Each structure stands twice: as C-alpha cells, then as structure tokens.
C-alpha cells in the first residue's frame, strides 16, 4: 500500500536524541529547544518563538494570552481542524464561521467585516495547504476594528505571503510539528510565534504554568512564583532534538516536497485543461511549501468512486475536514455568518494525494498512472 503520509526522516534524528539524553536534561527549555527557537526567530523574523507540545496547545495558549472571555466572538473558517475552534471555545467564546474562497480553500477575506459585531475579539485565518490567506486585507480589517489576529499556520511552515513568513504577520502565529506536517518533532509538537512584543513577557508566563520561571532561569529574578493563569505548554527537549534535525534539513525537505508537488501538477494539468478535475491555485503573492497536493472532482460521488479505485490499486488518498459548522459541537458553539456558498460544496469535492518527503519517485509515478487510467 502506498500510504497517504509518512513522517519525514532525514537521518540525524537519533544522534541528536542521544545527545539530548546524555545532556541530563529531557524536560522543556533545554539546549535543543533553544536551538530550534532561535533558528525560527532568525529564519522567520519573529519577535519570540516558544516551542509547545502541539499546535493545539499553541492555539490554546493564544486564547489565554488574548484573555478571551465567555461571550466573546472569534471569526474563522468552518473548513479547518477542530483545534482551531476548540482553543477559543474552551475560554467560553462563540465561534463565528465565515465562508471560504473556492480557489485556495482559505477564509474569504471579503466576508469577514460583515461578520464583526461588538463582541468580536479576534480573527483566526487558517493557511490551508500552506497557501497564505489574503493577510493585508485581514490585518487592515483587524486594525480598523481593534481586533487581534491569530494565524493558524499549522500547515504553513516555510510558506510566505509577500515575502513574509506565515505565522509572523498576525499578532500571534501557531505552527504544527505533527507527524503529518512537513517537519515533525518526533510525532507531536508545535510552536507559538509572538509577533507583538507587548505580548512576549506574558506569553512566557502562561507557557510556564503561570509562573515567571523563564525569567528566573535567565537570572532576571532571584526566585519564581505564580503570576498569572497558565498551563504546561513546553515541548520536551527530546522532541526538540528530533525537530532540530528536521530544521537543519528544512531547505532540503522543502525542495523535495516542491519537486513532488510540481510533478503531480505537470502530470495532471492535461486533465484539468480538459475539465475533468481542478488543481490547486497558488496566488501570485504566495510562496507555498508543498504541504499538500489535492485535486477536486465533480462531486462527492465522483470522489468516492476515485477513492475506491485508488484503494483497489493499493493507494491511500483521503478527503479532509468535515466543515465544523455542520458538526454537533459546531452547531452548539458556533454560528455561520452569511451564506455557505462554498465551504460544504468544495469540501465534498477535494481529495488529497500521497505527498511526503520520503515518497519514492516510482511510487508517485504509480499514483499518477493510476489516476490517469481512471480518467481514461
């Protein structure tokens, strides 16, 4: 079976993990954590990067940092992973879902302002497939209405919008290093990017269980104590060691994924020109990271038939999110603002193909040939 995904392995992970074990410090904020954070701060030009156990934890940390309260409203797309919404629902917020653009599957920036009320506190754009939302417009709306922007850049590590790294444009950015992402911290992991310097000190406190422990270890205070609400949002240094191996190879991983992505695009473009499928759209201002390659079929039935065809050929291709607003929790905790023109319809057409760093060219060719044979 050709899998849909396999975690990236570059070859130096075990050496670094053994080094972490030999250091005598396996908990958070060890040497490998500092290396990873500094690398991202310099590479992506973020004021402060803090490793977390997951992107879910990073989003929860953002909700705490913005002091989201019961009754507050947070705007986001419905076509996203449940963690995007849950982080704010846990604080008592009401989620306001906005329709997506069919070209990028990202939130439609032209519909955001109409969804704003006097209860709105934040906008959470989700960079689907590592392709940027229209951030200039979103940031202008946020500034006009005095709102925070939290970028869910779980899929966006190494992608850019007008030359700026995704996750560094909003007030806060959230990365994922889950095993399904381009880079992993040994299976689970994330990072919070603090781009508003006024939020940095409190972010460190919230991440360290509500204490000023980080200041204590830097020698800024002679003891640390409970200062604020918080939780344990540190990544173990053993995981950071795995991640460091991946970040050292980040450019190599990125180029390989882009090559695989382009191979799919070139091979399937004739089908798109013939009107049999639709291919991903990359806007001119966006540089993507080849996180995902998807095609769109005519409808849900057509997609189901193709999934079965590929499965018969020992190829695993998968659909993606069920829109949150149609779920029981989405109905309880959220509201869809305006018309659902594209969210549900487009989600039922989208099919993701196998794409991962270690995908062998012969296996990718098998996927392509099987697809071409399906369409005759």
Q: Each predicted region: which residue ranges?
A:
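N-terminal "arm"/small-domain region of PLP-dependent enzymes with the aminotransferase-like
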Residues: 1-26, 225-227, 354
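Phosphate-binding glycine-rich loop
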Residues: 26-73, 87-91, 97-99, 164
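PLP-dependent aminotransferase class I/II
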Residues: 34-39, 43-49, 110, 114, ...
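Structural detector of well-ordered beta-strand residues that form the stable sheet scaffold
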Residues: 50, 75, 96, 149-150, ...
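PLP-dependent aminotransferase-like
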Residues: 64-153, 160
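Hydrophobic/aromatic ligand-binding patch that stacks against planar heteroaromatic rings
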Residues: 86-88, 141, 165, 182, ...
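Conserved active-site segment immediately N-terminal to the catalytic lysine
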Residues: 151-186, 215-216, 222-227
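Active-site PLP attachment segment
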Residues: 168-212, 237
């Amino acid at each position: 079976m050709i899998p849909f995904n396999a975690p990236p392995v570059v070859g130096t992970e075990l050496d670094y993990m053994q080094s972490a074990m030999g250091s005598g410090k396996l908990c958070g904020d060890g040497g490998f954590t500092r290396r990873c954070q500094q690398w991202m701060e310099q590479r992506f030009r973020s004021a402060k990067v803090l490793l977390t156990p997951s992107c879910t934890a990073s989003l929860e940390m953002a909700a705490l940092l913005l002091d989201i309260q019961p009754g507050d409203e947070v705007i986001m797309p419905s076509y996203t992973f449940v963690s995007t919404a849950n982080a704010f629902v846990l604080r008592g917020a009401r989620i306001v879902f906005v329709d997506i653009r069919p070209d990028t599957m990202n939130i439609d920036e032209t519909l955001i302002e109409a969804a704003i009320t006097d209860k709105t506190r934040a906008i959470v754009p989700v960079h689907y497939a590592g392709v940027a939302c229209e951030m200039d417009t979103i940031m202008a709306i946020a500034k006009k209405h005095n709102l925070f922007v939290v970028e869910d850049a779980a899929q966006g590590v190494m992608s850019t919008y007008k030359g700026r790294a995704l996750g560094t444009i909003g007030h806060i950015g959230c990365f994922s290093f889950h095993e399904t992402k381009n880079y992993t911290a040994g299976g689970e992991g994330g990072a919070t990017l603090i781009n508003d310097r006024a939020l940095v000190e409190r972010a460190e406190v919230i991440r360290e269980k509500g204490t000023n422990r980080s200041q204590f270890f830097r020698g800024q205070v002679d003891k640390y104590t409970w200062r604020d609400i918080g939780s344990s949002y540190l990544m173990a240094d053993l995981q950071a060691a795995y991640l460091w191996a991946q970040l050292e190879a980040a450019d190599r991983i990125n180029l390989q994924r882009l090559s695989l992505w382009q191979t799919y695009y070139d091979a399937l473009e004739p089908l798109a020109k013939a009107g049999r499928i639709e291919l991903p759209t990359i806007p001119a201002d966006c540089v993507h990271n080849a996180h995902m390659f998807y095609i769109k079929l005519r409808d849900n039935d057509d997609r189901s038939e193709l999934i079965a065809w590929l499965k018969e050929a020992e190829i695993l291709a998968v659909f993606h999110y069920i829109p949150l607003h149609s779920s029981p929790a989405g109905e309880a905790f959220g509201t869809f603002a305006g018309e659902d023109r594209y969210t549900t319809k487009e989600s039922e057409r989208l099919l993701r193909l196998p794409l991962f760093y270690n995908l062998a060219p012969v296996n990718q060719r098998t996927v392509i040939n099987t697809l071409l044979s399906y369409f005759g």
